[in-house]
From Swiss-Prot:
Keywords noted in UniProt: Ribonucleoprotein, Ribosomal protein, RNA-binding, rRNA-binding
Annotated GO MF terms: rRNA binding; structural constituent of ribosome
Protein name: Large ribosomal subunit protein uL23
Residue intervals passing through the bilayer: none
Assembly, per entry: Part of the 50S ribosomal subunit. Contacts protein L29, and trigger factor when it is bound to the ribosome.
Family assignment from sequence similarity: Belongs to the universal ribosomal protein uL23 family.
NCBIfam families in UniProt: PRK05738.1-1 (NF004358), PRK05738.1-3 (NF004359), PRK05738.2-4 (NF004363), PRK05738.3-2 (NF004366)
Gene3D superfamilies in UniProt: 3.30.70.330
Cellular-component GO terms for this entry: ribonucleoprotein complex; ribosome
Tagged with keyword Plastid: no
Function text: One of the early assembly proteins it binds 23S rRNA. One of the proteins that surrounds the polypeptide exit tunnel on the outside of the ribosome. Forms the main docking site for trigger factor binding to the ribosome.
PANTHER family: 60S RIBOSOMAL PROTEIN L23A (PTHR11620)
């Protein structure tokens, strides 16, 4: 079993974008920004424990930080990790919290 304190540090934020919204509607998939050292097993355990849903699969990718300019200097944004979490049929995570 994975430490509960570690599970709380794995998921950083939901990643809301046009692509994430399309994936959510078409494939019952939710996109999260996760810790860069998180494994697929940790991500699956964290989502199942925190949101009380059943996870079918997890796909991850590392997003490279963009180079940005501030005046004459160049800087670089941090690299981060993205996780596409596919939920089982009938499972749903509502980030907005609107009751209908």
């Amino acid at each position: 079993m994975i430490n509960e304190e570690r599970l709380l540090k794995v998921l950083l934020a939901p990643n809301i974008s046009e692509k994430a919204t399309t994936a959510a509607e078409a494939n019952n998939t939710v996109v999260f920004k996760v810790a860069t050292d998180a494994t697929k097993a940790e991500i699956k355990a964290a989502v199942e424990k925190l949101f009380e849903v059943t996870v079918e699969g997890v796909n991850t990718l590392n997003v490279k930080g963009k180079v940005k300019r501030t005046g004459a200097r160049f800087g670089r944004r941090n690299d981060w990790k993205k996780a596409y979490v596919t939920l089982a049929e009938g499972s749903d995570i509502d980030f907005v919290g609107a009751e209908s």
